[in-house]
Amino acid sequence: MHSQRDRVLRLLWGVDAATNRGPKARWKPQDIAAAAIGIADEGGLEAVSLAKVAERLDMTTTAIYRYVDSKATLIDLMVDAAVGDPPEITGRDWRQRCRTWVRLLADRYREHPWLCDIRPTGMPRQPHAYGWIDALVRAVPDDADVHTLRLALLLDGLVRNNAGLERGLSGEAPEPWLGEAVAARFPALAAAPFQDVSDPSAELEYAVDAVLRGLS
């Protein structure tokens, strides 16, 4: 007998997705996901609960357990809907296609900043998450001599960490005296080329370029 979470994942994947006998459900998994995403976009992942999703859909808290039995199951639905299908990945060569992939995935994280709060515990479970990995694997030719799955997971991690940094930046300028204090205590750091690192997009681009250069 499958758990509720397993049944939801099977439904997302189209595995054993035959319609259950009995009355037709009023809501679809997409409706549950959309309601939960709306709450998370407004108040963060911590604001999401089964009770709040039920309230948004005008159903009782008891009724929502017919669709999802836990927040973990709900998050599976949310992630799959939020990342969505990967767009067409284009570029003049495979490295440029990897950069395009990173940029497009980063856009999804900006649309739904709460995604960076979901810490991976292994390979993903949702079909759309696998779709993004597959898109990058297909963007790299076989003769590139690259472990494409590892590359996809590495770049996904860079995007995730950068999204958290971007969300956490306060925009406040550092104290005016801090530069001199750093130079006095850490002269090697002061002598190194130094530039503003407050632009997460630029930092992500630098990190991705460093990874791709290392694969040449």
Q: Residue locations for each model-derived region?
A:
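N-terminal intrinsically disordered/low-complexity leader segments
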Residues: M1-R26, A188-F194
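Alpha-helical structural segments
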Residues: Q30-G38, E42, T73-I89, T100-L104, ...
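Helix-turn-helix
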Residues: D31, A35, I39-A72
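Short, residue-level hotspots on alpha-helical faces of the histone-fold
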Residues: L77, A81, L104, L153-G157, ...
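Phosphate/oxyanion-binding loops and surfaces in catalytic or ligand/nucleic-acid-binding neighborhoods
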Residues: D85, L158-L165, L169
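Hydrophobic alpha-helical connector segments
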Residues: P87-A129, L155
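Amphipathic alpha-helical packing segments from all-alpha helical-bundle domains
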Residues: T100, P120-L154, R160-G164, P174-A188
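A structured, mid-to-C-terminal "fold-capping" secondary-structure block
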Residues: G164, G171-S216
